[in-house]
A protein has these predicted regions:
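Active-site pocket-lining segments that scaffold enzyme catalytic pockets across diverse folds
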Residues: 111-119, 131
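A composition/biophysics-driven feature that prefers long, compositionally simple stretches
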Residues: 1-113
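C-terminal helix-coil-helix/basic helical segment that borders enzyme active sites and/or dimer interfaces
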Residues: 122-129
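A short, terminal or domain-edge coil/loop segment
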Residues: 17-34, 120-122, 142-148, 176-183
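Short catalytic-site patches enriched in acidic/histidine residues
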Residues: 74, 87-94, 98, 129-183
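Generic preference for flexible, low-structure residues
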Residues: 20-23, 41, 81, 101, ...
Length: 183
């Protein structure tokens, strides 16, 4: 099978316009608690039926399919429909590790934006600034360079640096304090 189908959120189908790696774009249905609330089981049943019908057309009944990160009820439902379920995390991660020239350009651009953002952050360190204010300098600098969001707010100061993995907060930075940043 050479076709690549992108199931996109309703109203976002246009985002794939012009991508030569996508054969067709279809509106996705969502089976998450956020989208479905207490009706999640009904949404999961609809999702199972829709994707099961599609899979039977594309690869046949009782085919082996790889799944990465899917609701347990959906995996069970697809098994009940006769599909053989395999964990696809390993092959998916190995495939993600291979980078094209375009991806390498994006990574390089991201690193430049991050380095420039960290430089701006370092210049903004002063007693009395809150961790949140200091964090916002990094985020603003990265976005101003057409970068993307910062995923985890791992900047802390003083006693908050140990134990590690405490997110940025309203704490005011004091003179001669250690400031820890994880990019």
């Amino acid at each position: 099978q050479q076709d690549t189908i992108l199931f996109e959120f309703k109203g976002c189908e246009h985002l794939a316009s012009g991508l030569n790696t996508i054969t067709s774009v279809e509106t996705s249905s969502t089976a998450s608690f956020v989208a479905s609330g207490i009706n999640i089981e009904e949404k999961e049943k609809q999702w199972i039926q829709n994707i099961s019908d599609r899979l039977q057309t594309l690869v046949g009944a009782k085919a082996t399919i790889g799944i990465e990160r899917l609701n347990a009820n959906i995996s069970i439902g697809l098994q009940d429909k006769g599909f053989v379920i395999k964990d696809a995390q390993l092959p998916v991660e190995l495939a993600r590790a291979i980078k094209s020239q375009e991806e390498m350009k994006c990574i390089h651009s991201s690193l430049q934006a991050t380095e420039n953002g960290v430089h701006q952050l370092k210049k903004s360190i002063k007693p009395g600034i809150s961790e949140n204010e200091l964090w916002s300098v990094l985020h603003q600098a990265i976005i101003a360079q057409d970068g993307d969001y910062c995923e985890t707010r791992l900047l802390s100061s003083g006693q908050k640096t140990n134990p590690w993995f405490q997110e940025t907060g309203p704490r005011l930075i004091q003179e001669n304090e250690l400031i820890a940043l994880d990019t």
